[in-house]
Amino acid sequence: MQKKFEDCVKTMLEIIGENPNREGLIKTPNRVFKAYEFLTSGYTQNVKEILNDALFESSNNEMVLVRDIEFYSLCEHHLLPFFGRAHVAYIPNKKVVGLSKIPRLVEVFARRLQIQEQLTEQIAQALMENADAKGVGVIIEARHMCVEMRGVQKANSTTTTSALRGIFLKNEKIREEFFSLINSAKQVRF
């Protein structure tokens, strides 16, 4: 499979008018293969395994928010990067998730070919289902190189998506608290 991938990269270089045998490009097919292997490693990771090993009994029934989770992903339409920050909150239902697992969850889905809307939904759904949470809220703010480098070429534009589940969808007060915590956090840095 690796050889087939590298041959495709070599062909692409030839099609755009490059010499894949010149010094600077000779190892490019292998480098691109390794990069894509890493950037799409989310396909080989199991969400249940990541979260189920880190669910802990707790009487906490208040919101848990992990904000400013930096991520990068590849747009499934152009294979160009998009990157930004995810804010993930949930309300526990007798169990809390190990805090490091929430960024890992974001990473699992970000390391796949994606669109931001789907990424947001997948994170929310996976946390809701696997943590048996009372509710989940996910907001992602990202910059897309397919928008900035090609097409409309609008540098520094940001796309924001949200996904709400359970009590976050049904209870306006909880939703407001979630949005307030995210917005107030932008003012304060440690």
UniProtKB/Swiss-Prot annotation:
Pathway: Cofactor biosynthesis; 7,8-dihydroneopterin triphosphate biosynthesis; 7,8-dihydroneopterin triphosphate from GTP: step 1/1. One of its GO terms (biological process) is tetrahydrofolate biosynthetic process. Gene3D superfamilies: 1.10.286.10, 3.30.1130.10. It catalyses: GTP + H2O = 7,8-dihydroneopterin 3'-triphosphate + formate + H(+). Its EC number is 3.5.4.16. Disulfide bonds: none annotated. Pfam families: GTP_cyclohydroI. This is GTP cyclohydrolase 1. It comes from Campylobacter jejuni subsp. doylei (strain ATCC BAA-1458 / RM4099 / 269.97).
